[in-house]
Amino acid sequence: MRVSVFAVGRMKSGPERELVERYFDRFAKAGPPLGLEFAGVSEIPESRGQTAQLRKAEEAQRIHEALDNAKSGGAKSGGTSSGGAALILLDERGKTLGSEAFAAIVGRMRDDGKRQLIVAIGGPDGHDPALRSRADLVLALGELTWPHQIARILIAEQLYRAATILAGHPYHRS
């Protein structure tokens, strides 16, 4: 299963970017024996719309287009079908999971035959309700609100951690 991260906004160079790249590199090396291939990060430009609602709708449209391209014949709305793409949205109002539960979900998506997993980090205004309804999972990284750069670091580390959990590697200590 190919794993992609879609992020609204750009990650500037600096220590945060280096840390994100380090964890994605680890995930890219740990994933293939488990059937997980890291396909990279796609940066989606922030909308310049006048209102939060318009900005969220424009950013959601860009994510919808990328998801439709990735699905290669899967369902167009209301979740995804077996063999298509799965969508996980990061959102402060999402479900809070532990690392082992997150790893189990990633493993189940892979085992169910999903060809692609897309993890989407929204813009400063969050995600459009239509995109939220389309997601297979809306996930919160805890109850705190995180800057987008830190959210990228956290999801990069959690994807790597999920791979190590699925592999039975001792990186994760429960």
UniProtKB/Swiss-Prot annotation:
Q: Which family does it belong to?
A: Belongs to the RNA methyltransferase RlmH family.
Briefly, what is this protein's role? Answer: Specifically methylates the pseudouridine at position 1915 (m3Psi1915) in 23S rRNA.
What UniProt keywords apply to this chain's record, in alphabetical order? Cytoplasm, Methyltransferase, rRNA processing, S-adenosyl-L-methionine, Transferase
This chain's protein is named Ribosomal RNA large subunit methyltransferase H
Q: Which Pfam families match?
A: SPOUT_MTase (PF02590)
The reactions it catalyses are: pseudouridine(1915) in 23S rRNA + S-adenosyl-L-methionine = N(3)-methylpseudouridine(1915) in 23S rRNA + S-adenosyl-L-homocysteine + H(+)
MF terms in GO: rRNA (pseudouridine-N3-)-methyltransferase activity
How is the subunit organization of this protein annotated in UniProt? Homodimer.
Which positions are annotated as binding S-adenosyl-L-methionine?
L90, G122, L141, G142, E143, L144, T145, W146
Q: Record's Gene Ontology CC terms?
A: cytoplasm
